[in-house]
Amino acid sequence: SKLPARVKKIGKEEAIAEYAKRYNVPQSWCEEAFDEEKQKADSIYHYHMDIHMEEIHQLRPNARFVMFDACFNGSFHLDDYLAGAYIFNPGKTIATLACSVNSIQDKWPDEFIGLMATGMRIGQFARLTCFLENHLIGDPTFRFTPNVNAGFDINQALVLKEGDVAFWKKQLDSPLVDMQALALRKLSDADYKDIVPLLKESYYHADSFMVRLEALRLMVLNHPAQSAGLIQDALNDSYELIRRYAGEYAEKNGSPSLIPAWVESYLQRSQEKRLRFKIMGGIDAFPYADVKAEIEKQTASMTLYNREHVDALLAQLPRQEKSMERDIETITNPKSKASHVRRDIRTFRNHPVGGKPLDMLLAFVKDESRPVDQSIIATEALGWYNLYHDKARIITSLKETKANDEALKKEVQKSIARLEGKNR
């Protein structure tokens, strides 16, 4: 389907030559894409690669609980959707967990799922792991018969022991690693006074990757000023999922102290495609000149059998810097189109970059000559720096902002609340 679509843009001969060169295959192979019988066979093949709602309607699903981790499976606002095909069915499915629109990539959707073995209700699992666009569709009171003894009723504990520091400290010694991870979460929720040392100790001494990931996550979410060292070590964790989260967190934290570990991770683990994707997603997080200097410093003492990935990053840095400078120029230039200013400011929500971009946003919010709607968008973008290592400076700057407009004043208050609030 891609080749015929390309033909419409550049012509048949050019498209065939382009694809043959790209995939290093004979042009005759590409010409087969226009064979009607092959197109029909391909269409049928691809159809059978997916699960379709009409197929579920013909079945009686036996799974009591189904967890979906793909986009649109929980689109309950539509007449028909996959999770609904399981629930509204003569089968035995009692509950589903699915996303209405997108499946967000930087979340941990099966966090604490192991506690279902202790008889934890599906609704409690959803409370612990829910995030935007994720929906529990079905009976939240459903639970499986326990096949692991937690030593207490977990559903009662999650309600009646909320904020009970002594109880949850005791669960740190539970033989169940998921319970140990839950204990960290509950102690964090209870504002346990020694939570930072506990999280560091848990990361460095826990045998279970579940506990290490929970400790890392809670540190990054709620103590960004103290989490750079943990992120640095997590980039080289033995568990690949932790390394990937560390790559994500390195960008959001943005501490210059992470540059050596960030560069080392790229150089030493570039064969790990999923980690490399996360690392490259944070290419704007640090000053480009500092990253370039660190690359040259580390590669000077390395024996490189292939420099392609090194040269690729070195070539990418000036392009990224030029693009960032262009965005800053668009935002700061009063003559720029308003729609372009709004567009470029919003990019810092998903990629909260420190340094010059952050300084620019802070100054922009205080510039009374800017249109109020643009100042509101810039203020809202600052609220997305909630994992930034120096978010205290942002909070201070926002508190010093003198907003006369009521809408802007409310947005300043909301962003301060986001930055000061607890993350779960």
Task: Label each region the model flagged.
Residues 155-158, 178-190, 210-222, 243-255, ...:
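Structural detector for internal amphipathic alpha-helices that build alpha-solenoid repeat scaffolds
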Residues 175-176, 207-208, 238-239, 270-272, ...:
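Short inter-helical turns and helix N-cap capping residues of alpha-solenoid HEAT/ARM repeat scaffolds
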Residues 69-72, 98-101, 129, 140, ...:
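Active-site proximal loops enriched in glycine and acidic residues that flank catalytic Cys/His/Asp
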Residues 109-193, 210-214:
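Caspase-like cysteine protease fold
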Residues 2-108:
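Catalytic cores of nucleophile-dependent amide-cleaving enzymes
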Residues 161-171, 192-203, 224-235, 255-267, ...:
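Amphipathic alpha-helical scaffolding segments comprising HEAT/armadillo-like alpha-solenoid repeats
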Residues 84-93, 110-135, 146, 226, ...:
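C-terminal, active-site-flanking charged/polar segments
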Residues 169-173, 181-185, 200-201, 213-217, ...:
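Amphipathic alpha-helical repeat scaffolds
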